Design a protein with these regions (language model features):
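Residues lining hydrophobic/aromatic ligand-binding pockets adjacent to catalytic sites
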Residues: 1-280
Length: 280
């Protein structure tokens, strides 16, 4: 049977002290404890800065060898703009991004066997950035063609109308994962499956992000689930179980903004998948 590894997006939430981390636990102890309960984590610190070698060594020291750490490419590559507005001219541009790309890959490779998928997480692009998907896909094609071998890559876009077969075929040609994001305006994975096969590499990569505006109108702390995502989680579990039966591995990461408390949501999804596979 294929492997389904489920974890959270980041492990550093202080709101988890009590409901997940033991009372009194210090942040420097979080990852070691986390790795005793989950098999994988997605770190977002790499989006904001290229990780130092000492940071990488710290992750290695606090996790077992079979633990998987996925990471985001730096913001300078996928966003490239000042403040909230992306710079479409600089995004993926060799002159502006390849230096950071190389520095990022050199340092992140220090994870060795622990290294999971490296994700190009793009923001939503308006028509003033790209008139349609075509110019973006041209830039993406060139960037992917220049990526070095020896790593697993994934791409996440947040333009719903760009999720089409030609996008999937481009990723498939490079064996790059199509990252499926359960996010405010993006379709569920099973909706994508009705249009085309979203499996473009040797594994599926799913990010359960949620609706930031919706959940922050309810809470801004992350010690418990406050939104019932049972219906969507059941659909994700069905999709992941189907992939496992096709011998396709999966990585799934849950954000606090999805339901309110990522560790519990991740465990809930894991239990549901186990039930489905046991009864199938």
């Amino acid at each position: 049977m294929a492997e389904i590894k489920i974890g959270t997006s980041s492990f550093s939430s202080r709101d988890w002290v009590g409901p997940f981390y033991p009372e009194g636990m210090q942040p420097r102890e979080f990852l070691k404890f986390y790795a005793q309960h989950f098999e994988t984590v997605e770190v977002d610190a790499t989006y904001y800065r290229i990780p130092s070698k000492s940071m990488i060594q710290g992750w290695n020291n606090n996790t077992p060898e079979d633990f998987i750490i996925s990471a985001k490419f730096p913001r300078s590559i996928v966003h490239a703009g000042e403040k909230a507005t992306p710079d479409a001219e600089k995004v993926l541009d060799p002159d502006h991004t390849y230096g950071d790309r190389d520095a990022f890959l050199q340092n992140i490779s220090g994870l060795g066997k622990r290294l999971g998928t490296l994700v190009l997480q793009f923001p939503y692009f308006s028509k003033k950035h790209f008139t349609d998907a075509g110019p973006f896909l041209e830039k993406l094609d060139r960037f992917l063609s220049d990526l070095p071998d020896g790593f697993k890559y994934g791409v996440e876009i947040r333009n719903r109308n760009w999720l089409k077969k030609d996008y999937a075929e481009l990723l498939r040609s490079y064996k790059v994962a199509l990252v499926i994001a359960d996010q405010a305006w993006m379709p569920h994975g099973d909706e994508i499956e009705k249009k085309f096969d979203p499996v473009t590499s040797d594994h599926i990569y799913i990010r359960l992000i949620g609706d930031r505006k919706e959940i922050e109108s309810i809470t801004k702390t992350w010690e418990k689930e406050v939104i019932d995502r049972s219906e969507r989680l059941d659909r994700w579990a069905d999709m992941l179980a189907r992939a496992a039966k096709r011998q396709i591995d999966s990585l799934v990461y849950v954000n606090n903004h999805y339901a309110g408390h990522a560790p519990e949501t991740a465990r809930r999804l894991s239990r549901r998948i186990t039930e489905i596979l046991r009864n199938s």
